[in-house]
Amino acid sequence: MNNMINIEVEKIIDPTPASDGAGVKLKRSIGVEPNYYDPFLMLDEFGSENKDDYIAGFPPHPHRGIETVTYMLAGSFEHKDSTGGQGKMTAGDVQWMKTGSGIIHSEMPAMNDGKLHGFQLWINMPASEKMSKPEYHYIDSDKMSTHKDKDKFIKVIAGKFKNSEGPIKKHNVDPIYFDVELNESKTFNHQVPSTHNSFIYLIKGEIEIGNNKHESVKDSPLILLSKGE
């Protein structure tokens, strides 16, 4: 335990307003600057209560050699792809897609109005897997492992926290993907392998990381972390 290194804030990135698909408005925090944060290629937050910001969706488009991870917090999207994979995502659901040698898919709102909110993360695939067969994994919120105590509630999408293990396993980068809700003035600790690049996306509130408190961290910033354990 004495050899453990505290993880500290390396950089704070304010998301850039952008649009994608057929005009869906979003905030992009990875994929704007030229710096490559291996293996992460892009991170978008999409969210609005105005249907005009999302109703046109993401019509059929191709991907190759990457993984896309979509996590819904509110609203619903319907996915269809060229492998025959399809599913309707609602709040709390996750879609993890390995595009491999290539796939064409669409993501369209399955709602006419109301609040839509979620995230999409792109992960680079290693050269040895870029021509692999595409895979589509739909993970229902009810099947997600969770951890709850008096201080926090954690949804484990990938990786392991205490006795809760995420459904994404046997992955080339051993991903850790948690949705963490902390009660006020409480603490979250987790060991991250020193080989991992890691980040926090603060959806709401204020957090203290390592030995430094960042009073100005608000409005959905991306917080890149130093390597440690």
Question: What is the role of each PLM region?
Answer:
Residues 80-98, 187, 192-193, 198-201, ...:
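Short acidic-glycine-tyrosine-enriched beta hairpin
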Residues 2-27:
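Hydrophobic alpha-helical membrane-insertion signals
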Residues 19-73, 144-189:
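A short glycine-rich, His/Asp/Glu-containing loop-to-beta-strand
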Residues 125-154:
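Long amphipathic alpha-helical segments that form oligomerization/scaffold cores
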Residues 100-129, 214-216, 226-229:
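Ligand-binding loop in jelly-roll beta-barrel domains
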Residues 87, 93, 105, 117-119, ...:
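Generic beta-strand structural signal
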